Amino acid sequence: MPLLDSFTVDHTRMAAPAVRVAKTMKTPHGDNITVFDLRFCRPNIEVMPERGIHTLEHLFAGFMRDHLNGDGVEIIDISPMGCRTGFYMSLIGTPDEQRVADSWKAAMADVLKVTDQRKIPELNEFQCGTYEMHSLKEAQEIAQHIVDSDIGINQNDDLALPKDKLAELHI
């Protein structure tokens, strides 16, 4: 099995909250696609609660588009990481990390303004696969942590695992 890009960086040295360009690619038609690692928690130290991250997934997707889309950028998808320490965001365009960080913080401020769980988009059995697994309170606690924090920038070169370590770890 090929080694995926996300597993070539040292998770023990990742700062959080922080933005990282996880991958860039060009489509056959010349469009730039960028995948960002939006790291909410330090890997293996913190984890977002499942109800909170699920609610945040519903809210974050729209709010982030409100703040980041435009001027050569269009978000394709924002999805939570299985490890529950962050989200991956795929988009068309190449915004710099600071623009992404500023939009992320603004989106989290919007999450804090949601007054009632009934205002969570697509919170019903027809549009959500686990519609009863939500917590606005937990989502807002996660959002408050981001609003209260400085969002850093994780650089791939600073986090790269050495080739000998990758060889040792690869199964």
UniProtKB/Swiss-Prot annotation:
Details of cofactor binding: Binds 1 Fe cation per subunit.
EC number: 4.4.1.21
InterPro entries: LuxS_sf (IPR037005), Metalloenz_LuxS/M16 (IPR011249), S-ribosylhomocysteinase (IPR003815)
Pfam families listed in its UniProt record: LuxS
SUPFAM superfamilies named among the record's database cross-references: LuxS/MPP-like metallohydrolase (SSF63411)
Named cofactor requirement(s): Fe cation
Catalytic activity: S-(5-deoxy-D-ribos-5-yl)-L-homocysteine = (S)-4,5-dihydroxypentane-2,3-dione + L-homocysteine
GO MF assignments: iron ion binding; S-ribosylhomocysteine lyase activity
Superkingdom of this protein's organism: Bacteria
Residues holding Fe cation: H54, H58, C128
Assembly description: Homodimer.
Primary role: Involved in the synthesis of autoinducer 2 (AI-2) which is secreted by bacteria and is used to communicate both the cell density and the metabolic potential of the environment. The regulation of gene expression in response to changes in cell density is called quorum sensing. Catalyzes the transformation of S-ribosylhomocysteine (RHC) to homocysteine (HC) and 4,5-dihydroxy-2,3-pentadione (DPD).
Name of the molecule in the record: S-ribosylhomocysteine lyase
Species this protein is from: Pectobacterium carotovorum subsp. carotovorum (strain PC1)
Lineage per the UniProt record: Bacteria, Pseudomonadati, Pseudomonadota, Gammaproteobacteria, Enterobacterales
